[in-house]
Amino acid sequence: MLFLGLAWLVLAACIAAGCFTPAHRLPTWLPNDKLLHFGAYFALAFPMAFVTQSWSRLLLIAIGLSIAGFLIEIVQRYIPGRDFSIADMVANTGGVVMGIGAGYMCLALHQALPDSLGTLL
């Protein structure tokens, strides 16, 4: 569990670094901005289903990650070459919802497998 927590913090720090970098310093080869937002928040949310199976806690985590995305968008308004984007917030929240949903489905599938199959995966 400690490794998962540390990996999550490193991922969050990398995402934050990308979010707070002025536009002229970002690589030009990056794919679609909205896909990056969706993927980043999906990656942050996915492991949360393995940390807690409580729907109320997952809802709080989803709200917290979505609020973090909103606050980052506000800060980006003051970073050279970056701007506030509602479409980015939608992509962030979509990534959170799909990440938690996919994580929960993977966990449920793993728990539903017979023990003999579960050891193979």
Predicted regions and their residues:
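Bulky hydrophobic segments
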Residues: 1-89, 93, 97-121
